[in-house]
């Protein structure tokens, strides 16, 4: 299998420097970090530790053979030593849509996992390869569809040194809806666990029913979400918890009191007190 290697020093430096340009909102303006458009190389030496932003590379659409979307790549310390690593794929919200080019990939670093990594708030002992694809802003639908998520996951598993039983999915808002759509269509084919934030699960449960419970799922939602009402997650999660054939493996719902369409930063930076990373790593695909 072809394996990705370390980002170039230039790409890492450009990305870190461009952190000053990342937006705090969901609109236009400066597009954030810059990086290398080169193909991923095969690494021969393990990556060193240090600031997480130094192990980031932009992979624009069309720059990596077989990649269905442009994406941002983060590799953990030690990657390249031949040890398979867990994979975490982050699906962003609708406000970060783009064309997958170097110009628009920086939008992904506004919030959540990519923001933590770019701001060097991602600890060295967190072992995930993290890949963050960008949705097509020209697509008819706003959110990724199940087969698009599946295609990216399988690309990642083939091109990186991934522990095949430790593939995890997470998403916010539109990305969470895309994750639910994927889980409804593909259940436990690949994914060992999912963390979904501020996305509705009504369509997913209507499509897949109790089969959704074959994958460990931890959902987070704001109590006063004005975009995706909390009932759109409470109702299907309650139905999922009541399933008996099959009974759910591990499904959880955490509702943040007084929170609107948000909740991702306190979830991903663990300030809300829920260690989602340890929880994910506690599950493996069988």
Identify the meaning behind each predicted range.
Residues 26-87, 128, 177, 181-186, ...:
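A domain-start/cap signature at the N-terminus of enzymes
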Residues 77-83, 137-174:
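Gly/Ser-rich "nucleophile elbow"/oxyanion-hole loop immediately N-terminal to the catalytic nucleophile
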Residues 126-128, 211-217:
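Short, proline-enriched alpha-helix->beta-strand connector loops that line the catalytic pocket
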Residues 158-159, 165-211:
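Primarily recognizes the serine-hydrolase "nucleophile elbow" in alpha/beta-hydrolase
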């Amino acid at each position: 299998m072809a394996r990705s290697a370390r980002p170039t020093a230039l790409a890492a430096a450009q990305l870190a420097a461009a952190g000053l340009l990342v937006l705090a909102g969901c609109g236009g303006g400066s597009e954030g970090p810059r990086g290398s458009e080169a193909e991923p190389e095969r690494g021969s030496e393990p990556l060193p530790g240090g600031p997480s932003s130094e192990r980031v590379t932009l992979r624009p659409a069309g720059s990596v053979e077989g990649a269905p979307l442009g994406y941002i790549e983060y590799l953990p310390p030690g990657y390249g030593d031949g040890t398979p690593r867990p994979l975490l794929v982050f699906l962003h919200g609708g406000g970060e849509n783009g064309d997958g080019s170097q110009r628009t990939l920086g939008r992904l670093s506004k919030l959540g996992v990519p923001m933590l990594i770019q701001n060097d708030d991602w600890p060295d002992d967190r072992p995930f390869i993290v890949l963050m694809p960008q949705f097509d802003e020209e697509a008819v639908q706003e959110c990724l569809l199940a087969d698009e998520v599946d295609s990216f996951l399988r690309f990642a598993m083939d091109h990186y040194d991934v522990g095949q039983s430790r593939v995890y999915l997470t998403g916010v808002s539109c990305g969470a809806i895309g994750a639910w759509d994927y889980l409804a269509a593909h259940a436990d084919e690949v994914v060992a666990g999912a963390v979904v934030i501020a996305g509705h699960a009504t369509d997913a449960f209507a499509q897949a029913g109790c089969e959704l419970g074959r994958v460990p799922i931890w959902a987070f939602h704001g109590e006063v979400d004005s975009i995706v009402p909390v009932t759109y997650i409470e109702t299907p999660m309650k139905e999922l918890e009541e399933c008996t054939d099959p009974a759910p493996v591990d499904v959880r719902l955490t509702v943040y009191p007084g929170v609107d369409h948000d909740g991702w930063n306190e979830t991903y930076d663990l300030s809300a007190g829920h260690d989602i990373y340890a929880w994910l790593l506690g599950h493996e695909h069988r």
